[in-house]
Amino acid sequence: MASLNENQKFWARVTELARQSIGKQAYDFFIEPAQLMSVEQDTANILLDSGMKKDYWKKQSDLITTAGFEVFGRMIDYELYANDELTDIELRRLNNQSPVDEPLSVAKPTSPLVSGLNEKYNFENFVQGPGNRWTLAAAIAVADKPGDTYNPLFIYGGAGLGKTHLMHAIGNQILTDNPTARIKYVSSENFVNDYVNATRKNQMESFENTYRNLDLLLLDDVQFFSDKEGTKNEFFNTFNALYDKGSQIVLTSDRIPQELNNLEDRLVSRFSWGLTTDITAPDYETRMAILLIKSESSHLEFPSETLSYIAGQIDSNVRELEGALNRVEFVARANGISIVDIETASQALRSLKNATQQSLSNLTIKKIQDEVANYYHISFSDLVGPKRPKEIAFPRQIAMYLVRELLGTSLPAIGTAFGGRDHTTVMYAYKQISDKMKNDMDVQKDIDSIKRKF
């Protein structure tokens, strides 16, 4: 076993090499939280804060090899462990050694080149939460090693959840690390327009030079891609040209690739070559964090209870949350209010609440039941019937939760609508789903997807 002093030197060298070879965002997310627990029999035991980061670390063997030869004078292998996967025995064994921590240096991003990027979107001002944590991790990994880690990166989710923010953040970070990088951000609609204009003006060579020689292509909202064969063929060829030369491709959509009915199977399959990851609606804590950050620049005072009230009123997406805060600010300034209380916020958001209520005015228990049954591929009779296997009981709880949440129906009335069940059963179902919504991303995603149907 290596001495503690040698271990410290070894880990210090690993982190130093990492800082020299990867971007700050990737270092902060993947390297900084990692801990060297011990070096035993020429194997470094490294503890990660999440098993999701193992794939990234498996590609960092050069760091370990180089540091091993420099400090120990021999080849050092490494074993990866994760806090969320460890057994008690492994944890006790690994904790016999103290981790080594290294401080980080902070690098300021530079201004982007003319490439369609918006410099205000970066990783630093992207608020992380349960609904976007792993997508953020993937974006950071892509920005650190474009064309290598996840290519293409396909991000999907509802409107206003931060997909475009992450696209620009990837581009801005890559441009910071490599100011000569050729980067283009473009919506699918503008890609189509560029192609149509090029064909009309007989400028296809210029079009191909623009798109096929990029280091990074950021294509937003691919669900709006044209049905025209010429456009799809051109993008297919552009995708292949970029992929073959190792350029990074990032795509966003409001749905998974397999649901993009306007695109050919050959394109859809390519979209799935890398990593497909989603963003769901922000939970309460994330909404509060967003409001705290945004309110700091308003020059008005927002007590925490006021922000909590706003966060409780808007649970759909970040864009609507920011819009609600802007509306509250406007009403406060118009009335000469410098300390924004709940009454002011309530007054400002009243019209928004009325609009939401209007959109749900035609919603019924039966419509919710039908939508949930359809989403989980079960029959209506099973949803409200006596069967209790998990594949039926869970959708039933989801449906009860949504009826209570969206319609405010009484517990006994909900029980009656679900086959005459007791109100305590409904109460239990509502609590179960409410608890899962706090930390289960799959449940959050299901609820968000079903809500969007309404």
Curated annotation (Swiss-Prot):
GO terms for biological process: DNA replication initiation; regulation of DNA replication. Residues 116-332 are annotated as: Domain III, AAA+ region. Keywords: ATP-binding, Cytoplasm, DNA replication, DNA-binding, Lipid-binding, Nucleotide-binding. GO terms for cellular component: cytoplasm; plasma membrane. ATP binds at G160, G162, K163, T164. It holds the Pfam family Bac_DnaA_C. Residues 1-77 are annotated as: Domain I, interacts with DnaA modulators. GO terms for molecular function: ATP binding; ATP hydrolysis activity; DNA replication origin binding; lipid binding. It is found in: Cytoplasm. Residues 77-115 are annotated as: Domain II. Its main location: cytoplasm. Residues 333-454 are annotated as: Domain IV, binds dsDNA. Belongs to the DnaA family. Plays an essential role in the initiation and regulation of chromosomal replication. ATP-DnaA binds to the origin of replication (oriC) to initiate formation of the DNA replication initiation complex once per cell cycle. Binds the DnaA box (a 9 base pair repeat at the origin) and separates the double-stranded (ds)DNA. Forms a right-handed helical filament on oriC DNA; dsDNA binds to the exterior of the filament while single-stranded (ss)DNA is stabiized in the filament's interior. Oligomerizes as a right-handed, spiral filament on DNA at oriC. Domain I is involved in oligomerization and binding regulators, domain II is flexibile and of varying length in different bacteria, domain III forms the AAA+ region, while domain IV binds dsDNA. This is Chromosomal replication initiator protein DnaA. It comes from Lactococcus lactis subsp. cremoris (strain MG1363).
